[in-house]
Amino acid sequence: MTSSGKVRIYELSKDLGLENKDVLDAAEKLSIAAKSHSSSISDAEAGKIRSLLGKGGNGAKPAAAAPAKPAPGKAILSVKKAAPATPSKPTPAVSKPVAKPVAAKPVVTKPAAAVKPQAAPKPPAAATPKPVISKPAPALVKAAAAPARPTAAKPVPRPAAAKPQVVSKPAAGKPKLVSKPKATAKPTAPTPRPTPARPTPRPAGAGSPARPTPGQGQPKPQIIRSGAPSRPGAPTRAGAPAKPGAPSRPTPRPELVGKPVPRRPAGTGVPQRQGGPSRPGAPTRQGRPGMPPRSGNTLELVGKPIRRDGSTTGSGRPGAPTRPGAPGRPGMPAGMRKPVAPGELMQLQKPVGRPAAPAPRRPDAPTKAGAGAGTATPPVARPNSPSAPRRPSFRPGGPGGQRRPGRPDWDDSARLDALRSRSPQKQRQKVHIIGENDDSLAAQTGGFAGEQENMVLSASLARPAKPKSQQRTAPKPVAAMRKRKKETARQRQRRRAMELRAAREAKQVRPEMIVVPEDNLTVQELADMLSVESSEIIKSLFFKGIIATVTQTLDMPTIEAVADEFGVPVLQDDVEEAAKKTVEMIEEADKAHLIRRPPVVTVMGHVDHGKTSLLDAIRQARVAAGEAGGITQHIGAYQVEIEHNNEQRKLTFLDTPGHEAFTAMRARGTKVTDVAVLVVAADDGVRPQTLEAISHARAAEVPIVVAINKIDKEGSSPERVKQELSEQNLLAEDWGGDVVMVPVSAIKGENIDKLLEMLLLVTEVEDLQANPDRLARGTVIEAHLDKAKGPVATLLVQNGTLKTGDVLAAGPVLGKVRAMVDDNRQRLKQAGPSFAVEALGFSEVPTAGDEFEVYPDEKSARAVVGDRASDARATRLAQQMASRRVSLTAMSGQANDGELKELNLILKADVQGSVEAILGSLEQLPKDEVQVRVLLSAPGEITETDVDLAAASGAVIVGFNTSMASGAKKAADATGVDVRDYDVIYKLLEDIQMAMEGLLEPELVEEALGEAEVRAVFTIGKSAVAGCYVTTGKLHRNCRVRVHRGKQVVYEGDLDSLRRNKDDVKEVATGFECGVGTDRFANWEEGDRIEAFKMVTQRRKLTT
């Protein structure tokens, strides 16, 4: 039945036990609209069809007034229980409900008689009934509706069992069913088990064993003819939801006379479990041979049952033969049938029109209500499909599991019904737990029914054989796989070759830096240094317009360009030469007066790796905080006194810049040092300036102590730094090498004492000595022009003692020491070996890196200075001419063409080292289109003379960490001279490069506007107009257009006319049509593509 109170044709046919065709014919006679077996009809129409088919016959149902009398030997007897009649909406019934009902035994009622409640009789100790068949009366009795399933909340009270009333009507040759109550059991009705899938409530008696209460009699069983089953208002099954509101259908029932005679031996039943929980829809466990007797009434069949041909069998189908082994005997387990003769079959039914197959239950579950102790299991017929989803009751293969026994084994419709009844979500087979009483099941499955069921189960589980076509084509995928395997073999060879090539490239790690000796290399030598193939170098040169072979020599600019393309910086050999110690400070006469001197330690490393912060931690000062941009841009000299082996020892530290522009400074620092401290950040590793510092230290042949800084920072990895340094042949002591590596933290001050101790140990091995009793010799570390003090130089005394008033010569500069101060700004009278001081009294700013020497008198000093000044002047002129890199012919040609651009600069810086660093960086800027002319470069402040020179030559004054003298700013404002001051070298170089680019003429570039497609051509007089559709962008009037026809450009010029709907417009956007016309082109064709663009100016960039 559908959820809206309607019945489908196929459900009605199953209820009536007829074919769908018979029901459709009956509906057609009654003018009821029903097209097919799945059509739905109302309950009233279903009642009309039932009445017609009941009167008409077909052997389905006897008429209500005159029931058909079956022929002798043709009737099938069935013991039927009285169903508890409390659905969710109970239908009117004859019986009176009781507040707490018990499960009723089937009673034999006279159709016209009313059913009265009666106490349940005591169940007998053990018996199998012998039924006595009585002829049914023509009167009708209304059957109660099938009970509904319980909800999870509370059970619904059920009616009391009906009082049996036996009416005898003798019939010759028919057996009698004799029943005698024996004992009364006292089980407690269990709590109904909720079922989530079925919300409709079911009385507690449904699915529960018959447990009569004391003081109540047990009803007697009744015999109902299978040909006339009782029909409730709505066809329901045991455990299915009740359909409220459906009218009940009266059904004539035969009566029982007498009491049942015990036939089976005692001990064949299974004792009823008391209080066990029942599962709704679980089958009743029947008695088994060899088991203790089951309490309750038993029935005994006396005489031969009567069969009638064409009558409705237990399955509800007319004419269907009775299935052998159907569960019709008490004591037989559900699903296990004893093979008997076909004529001796007896079907036990419930008093419902559509009996349903109960689902299998657990072995320990009690019997269902209405199937009292010792009563026969009702026949299992195929239920109609309910509207709500239900639990499938078909359990193949499980012990005690029931097949759908309403149809014979050879009927395939039984399997089809089983498949249809399963919903896709519930097709998983549920495991049935075998209890202790199921041991005898195996012995009962060997009969005809067991063999038939096993055969059906095996057939249902068997895998179908593969078609011959699939078996024939099975080898084809193997062949295809073999074919693909051959193809992948060639691909594997190519992949292996690529992997080998990649492995070779991985092994040939490109260096971080290369050093070029003598300013030239051959192509093969450059390829070996860069760890690339020589063909890659030749290809790179070819793209630069240079045809070269592997033996061709390349000059320095070409080498730098190629190396820069591969990402490797180039270090010239002369820079490394600057780090070599060329002058021996200790002479032969000093060896008799040598004493130990403090070591000079130079701190080197990459920019921002913490060199100055490490020195601050050693000196307990904050020099790094005062550095512009946080980076060191000049050399600082400091002296630290520490305690070692219970004596005070001194260390002189030189702090060098880490920026790439200060290569010469690092070389000078390395030249005068005794030990190089290489600072490497633990979170950054080895960087280009780190490698450069390593090369400087090796060129100066000084030992290296590695300080792995920033170990407190997240992501630091000292082991990774050691690994990278090992690739540069710096192997740590704990790795089996000879290089001291100390992890430190400059911020937190970790391991600073250990680093100092290691420095002293290394310098003790070097045995550093000097003669303090001679005239001083040393090196100019740094020099600058102080506006108050004049030229100031930082001097490192390497041998002898420098005193106030000494006359010295520093390169071409003559000086007389007027005063000396140390790093703490304390004035000194003298400075011994390895002492760094700032000295005043030079005639001009000396050049950083020059050696100084003290002479006994001023005359000898001036003679030496004069010779050096002449040499320095010649060298300076040569450098200025070389910086031009432009011949007179080239200059005149560029001037005539208007391509010669010059940028004049006047450079003033704080110290000499900064001047040479800036000049070195300017040399590396591209000079093909703009020349940089440095008219003046010197340390010191910007003076009024500098402003006058800049005004006369049109130069820009660039100051670096310096200030302006009095009157210079006023003069600059009056003459309009641009004065720039910087404190970070990055910003200075960027601004100079942008100024050079500003001198270049801007270039014109195309800017795309849109495209249009010519869809029509209109001739207007002698000219033609193209009807276009704008596909992308916009078309602007007076813009440039390019007409494409296929792959050729047929016209390029201005767009003179642009119209839309005969109106002149300035622009047409995407998706609109327009007319395009040009004065110089009229040869338009359909399909032409118009490209619109405009010319815009763009700032040019410097190119190398």
From Swiss-Prot:
Binding positions for GTP per the UniProt entry: 605-612, 655-659, 709-712
Subcellular location: Cytoplasm
Matching SUPFAM superfamilies: Initiation factor IF2/eIF5b, domain 3, P-loop containing nucleoside triphosphate hydrolases, Translation proteins
Region (G4): 709-712
Record field: compositional bias (Basic residues): 481-495
Annotated Low complexity bias: 60-119, 127-164, 203-215, 227-246, 311-336, 366-396
Annotated Pro residues bias: 189-202
Compositional bias per record (Basic and acidic residues), positions renumbered to this chain: 406-420
Keywords: Cytoplasm, GTP-binding, Initiation factor, Nucleotide-binding, Protein biosynthesis
Region (G2): 630-634
Region (Disordered): 51-444, 461-497
Gene Ontology molecular-function annotations: GTP binding; GTPase activity; translation initiation factor activity
One GO term describing the cellular component: cytosol
Top-level taxon of the source organism: Bacteria
Region (G3): 655-658
Region (G5): 745-747
Region (G1): 605-612
UniProt xrefs under InterPro entries: EF-G-like_DII, IF2_II, IF2_N, P-loop_NTPase, Small_GTP-bd, T_Tr_GTP-bd_dom, TF_IF2_bacterial-like, TIF_IF2
CDD domains noted in UniProt: IF2_eIF5B (cd01887), IF2_mtIF2_II (cd03702), mtIF2_IVc (cd03692)
Principal cellular location given in the protein's record: cytoplasm
Family recorded in the similarity comment: Belongs to the TRAFAC class translation factor GTPase superfamily. Classic translation factor GTPase family. IF-2 subfamily.
HAMAP family per the UniProt record, alphabetical: IF_2_B
Protein purpose: One of the essential components for the initiation of protein synthesis. Protects formylmethionyl-tRNA from spontaneous hydrolysis and promotes its binding to the 30S ribosomal subunits. Also involved in the hydrolysis of GTP during the formation of the 70S ribosomal complex.
Name used for this protein in its record: Translation initiation factor IF-2
Organism in which the protein naturally occurs: Synechococcus sp. (strain CC9605)
Phylogenetic lineage: Bacteria, Bacillati, Cyanobacteriota, Cyanophyceae, Synechococcales
Gene name linked to the record: infB
